[in-house]
A protein has these predicted regions:
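C-terminal, charge/polar-rich interaction regions
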Residues: 39-43, 71
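Primary mode marks residue(s) on the alpha4-beta5-alpha5 output face of response regulator receiver
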Residues: 1-36
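Hydrophobic alpha-helical bundle architecture
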Residues: 36-37, 124, 139-149
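Catalytic phosphate/nucleotide-handling subdomain of diverse soluble enzymes
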Residues: 59-85
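Long, amphipathic alpha-helical stalk/connector segments used for oligomerization, subunit docking
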Residues: 75, 79-132
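Conserved phosphate/anionic-ligand binding catalytic regions in large, soluble enzymes, centered on
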Residues: 43-58
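Conserved small/polar residues in nucleotide/adenosyl-binding loops
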Residues: 150-157
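Short, well-ordered loop/turn and helix-capping segments at boundaries between secondary-structure elements
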Residues: 55, 59-63, 89, 93, ...
Length: 157
């Protein structure tokens, strides 16, 4: 059985003729600007960049399931760094979902889920066209912020 435990459905609350009380089912209703922030948080910082990085390395290392990659300590460390260290300081908080909690769920529930048959090969499709949106927003946010830290590489022995 394929099952994904976590779900987020954020919809613009704009129904001129009314709507059922779908929030009782967990749907989050908000304004258009917040919906856009949630999408940007997911696509540009807290999920898709992590998935894309795992996909590329998964293809190179011969993995056939994204969930199996999370058992590799080095790959897990890489996506934790992308999410927490690189993304979280500059992500735009949509206010309706906490970015840190979102990344926690992505790294501890969603990506490691063995019942999601996601493959690195599928996610890596058209990676060259995804890079700008997956990583570009984080890079732009760093360049525009004061939290850009640069440490020169130490010489290797």
């Amino acid at each position: 059985m394929n099952a994904e435990e976590c779900e987020y459905l954020v919809i613009e609350d704009w129904f001129p003729n009314g709507r059922p009380e779908l929030e009782k089912g967990g749907i989050m209703f908000t304004d258009r600007a917040t919906v856009d922030k949630v999408e940007k948080m997911k696509v540009c910082t807290c999920l898709n960049p992590l998935h894309t990085a795992l996909a590329v390395f998964g293809c190179l290392l011969g993995y056939t399931k994204i969930s199996d990659e999370m058992k590799d300590a080095e790959l897990r460390k890489m996506v934790e760094r992308i999410g927490y260290t690189e993304g979280l300081p500059v992500v735009v908080d949509p206010g309706i979902l906490d970015p840190k909690e979102f990344i926690d769920t992505v790294l501890n529930v969603r990506i490691p889920n063995p019942f999601m048959p996601d493959t690195p090969q599928r996610i890596a499709t058209d990676t060259s066209q995804k890079l700008a949106i997956r990583f570009g927003e984080t890079v732009k946010n760093y360049l525009a912020s004061d939290c850009l830290l640069y440490t020169s590489p130490s010489p290797r022995d």
